[in-house]
């Protein structure tokens, strides 16, 4: 059965390692018969969450007028979410973290999907990715 796969490439570098792996994931998912869309988060305008809770009182609408409403709707509509980030100081890059934070008002519509993670880093010690993976897992299991 075909699934809607949304890949969020958090890397600020187009053609960087994370972005290349996103393209390979997309290719494999398409070859398996799935509908795939990849969004390069760095190419979108996404303000960080202000924690003003406007969204809580306005049906999930955000005070920021940017590309996040479109991204969030695609996240809600997807069956599978792929989150990709380079490891920056043992965590997710700022671009993808802003997207994650901005899902707060409609999180119940995002959770309970299949999640996959693509993590890249320059460090040869695999444990350096542990905190980043914990952030991703915490988000998915919230």
Regions found by a protein language model. Give the residues of each.
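Aromatic side chains
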Residues: 25, 88-90, 116-117, 136
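Short, glycine-/small-residue-rich phosphate/pyrophosphate-handling segment
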Residues: 107-142
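N-terminal beta1-alpha1-beta2 submodule of the flavodoxin-like/Rossmannoid cofactor-binding fold
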Residues: 1-84, 90-106
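Short glycine-rich anion-binding loops that position phosphate/pyrophosphate groups of nucleotides
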Residues: 87-89, 122-123
């Amino acid at each position: 059965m075909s699934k809607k796969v949304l890949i969020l490439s958090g890397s600020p570098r187009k053609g960087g390692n994370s972005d290349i792996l996103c393209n390979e994931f997309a290719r494999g998912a398409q070859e398996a018969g799935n509908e795939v869309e990849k969004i390069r988060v760095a190419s979108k305008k996404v303000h960080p969450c202000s924690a003003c809770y406007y969204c809580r009182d306005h049906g999930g609408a955000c005070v920021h007028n940017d590309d996040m409403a479109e991204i969030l709707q695609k996240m809600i509509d997807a069956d599978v979410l792929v989150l990709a980030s380079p490891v920056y100081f043992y965590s997710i890059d700022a671009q993808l973290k802003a997207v994650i934070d901005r899902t707060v008002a409609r999180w119940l519509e995002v959770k309970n999907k299949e999640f996959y993670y693509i993590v890249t880093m320059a460090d040869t010690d695999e444990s350096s990715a542990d905190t980043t993976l914990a952030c991703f897992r915490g988000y998915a299991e919230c």
